[in-house]
Amino acid sequence: MATVSNVWQPEFMQGRFFRLFVSHTSAHRQAVGALRAALLPHGVVAFVAHDAIQPTQEWLDVIVRALREAEALAAYLTGDFHDSAWTDQEVGAAVGRELLVLPLKVDQDPYGFIGHYQAMNANIDTGVLARQIAAVLRTHGLTKRPMAEAVVDRFVHSDGWNSARENLNRLKELPADVWAPWLVEAVRLATSSNTEIQTADVGFGQSTVAAEALKLIDSLPGP
């Protein structure tokens, strides 16, 4: 995997994350920041550029670099979205790269390049919205393979019993056709090298996360 900017690496966390650029205006930074936090457990790191009035050249460079490295874009569509000097350009850049664009409708319908896209309702609980976004990224043809890499890597880096259980559940949600041999091997190795995965129980002590993960990958169809 090519080296990417450190803007995509969450603090105190390591490994591979799916890179989602979230285009929004500065008035909605708090809501988008909450969404960013809710996406992290799903293996998604959101870059949340905002509508600075007079951004410095350095800040613009960061935005341009993030747009080049993003694997999908979400447009947080509010009434002031079109008034921004930057948001439409960010969406246009993603469309030009043929990335998946997710319109998140707060109070503005998709328009322009994404006018024909089906919007997701953003006026719901942030955790629910994050789960819905992650579900789309896991299954859409443009994103399901890089998303699988991120989900498997989250499992490999499970740092507690709860995270091991949650990450196991996300493994189970991956489509069968994204399981490249090296992803299968990464899961298999984690079951013997990560003590949290080895010792976390599931089903009221009836099994362990490691055992269930092995059962999952052994049930996958062959190449």
Model-derived features: where do they sit?
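Short catalytic-loop micro-motif centered on adjacent basic/acidic residues
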Residues: 21-23, 48-49
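Residue-level signal for short, function-critical loop segments
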Residues: 24-26, 78-79
